[in-house]
Swiss-Prot record:
It holds the Pfam family Cpn60_TCP1. The gene is groEL2. This is Chaperonin GroEL 2. It comes from Prochlorococcus marinus (strain NATL1A). SUPFAM superfamilies: GroEL apical domain-like, GroEL equatorial domain-like. ATP binds at T29, L30, G31, P32, D86, G87, T88, T89, T90, G413, N479, A480, A481, D495. Its EC number is 5.6.1.7. It is an enzyme of class 5 (isomerase). It comes from the Bacteria. Transmembrane segments: none annotated.
Amino acid sequence: MAKRIIYNEQARRALERGIDILAESVAVTLGPKGRNVVLEKKFGAPQIINDGVTIAKEIELEDHIENTGVALIRQAASKTNDAAGDGTTTATVLAHAMVKAGLKNVAAGANAITLKKGIDKATDFLVEKIKDHSKPISDSNAIAQCGTIAAGNDEEVGKMIADAMDKVGKEGVISLEEGKSMTTELEVTEGMRFDKGYISPYFATDTERMEAVLDEPYILLTDKKIGLVQDLVPVLEQVAKTGKPLLIIAEDIEKEALATLVVNRLRGVLNVAAVKAPGFGDRRKAMLEDMAVLTNGQLITEDAGLKLENATLDMLGTSRRVTINKDTSTIVAEGNEVAVNARCEQIKKQMDETDSTYDKEKLQERLAKLSGGVAVVKVGAATETEMKDKKLRLEDAINATKAAVEEGIVPGGGTTLAHLAPALEDWSSTNLSGEELIGANIVEAALTSPLMRIAENAGANGAVVAENVKSKPVNDGYNAATGEYVDMLSAGIVDPAKVTRSGLQNAASIAGMVLTTECIVADLPEKKDSSPAGGGMGGDFDY
């Protein structure tokens, strides 16, 4: 396919046009009085949302060159979303402000490479300053405040997430599901829960609720298919003598063995239940090993030279209680902290070593199931459109609270960046010179842009608000919801330091790339073929 090649100023201006379009679409959502954006969908109802990165992903322009600008700034939003899970709109607004100011300097003859060096040095200085300003989270109240701000000032959501974090701990997983009612509810599962239910409904001990509840059972874990009942007989006899229930978790249990277990259960010889092992392949084996650690048992696998027919009672795991329904099983174990902690450390090391986001997610789930448990937020809403918007806000809130626990909090509402502008000005004027200093000044000018946009979305004069905030003490900022200047930490208007930091770093990175662009190679728009002639017609000709 033929390409179009554009150089110098023309190339940078084309990128700028794309960046302007995306930044404006996303910036309208910033702050407590930010507006919504409606996304048209090819199928189904339009989506009304307030989430920067989702809007950015939807924007595609007809002009290939302008679209390249959109893709570049979308990357700043996506990278911030990947790192911190929130702050995507702030990153977009910052990147846009840096690009606008930088392009003016490049057009006036400044050296783009030296400007980029100045931008990078200023960013490194600011990252250190953000670390100094951040305050560690001390109580669930601060977590609730973080969640409230990230969810678009929804206090109920903030409190719910703080409760969930309290119950499942820092390593726990908080997942979102679409609820069946109008209200948003929180459900916390203690212990390890996995998505496999009983193999046969005849294992249910509570026929009204169709649940199998086993108190203080033995747990047999194996990664093989159980086909012959003879393999199970030695274990069944040993467990029957103790009078305790037995849970079997295996790859599968085939008809003959299953029938024997069901008959024993119905006759009251042995209270037994069987469940298929969760996951596939290596992941299934890893989850079974996790369960073995949790229940203080052994995974009976031929890889370790263990056979089912030779299994003894001391190879079986134990737990306080097991609850199984048709879809899920929950094991509540206790008293094996040392081994569980060692296993958790091992999983954390694997998380540090892997580059795959998917693997990280799965390892995080395993870690949560072992260490804390799982909290499920069931999102309730009147319509599907509202449900989708709520779900995105909740996702942001969960990510923001996790980021806050990791790196602490800073005053929100664009306040921290605005207060850092004078500090950057002092530092850069003594440590930088020439065009590097101009690069630092570009960053300094951009630092107030999120605050200005928040104020403008609330109907105030952004430039006036920014100057007022700069002259006030470090923690004081502009509360756009009420139009007052307040102590942001006392008012509960906080941002995770990680969100502020990663937004700034990604914005500076993209701005540097745009400023140092000298040539763009893009596809030429395809010419549409003229429509073919219909029967008795002469194509696109006028006769």
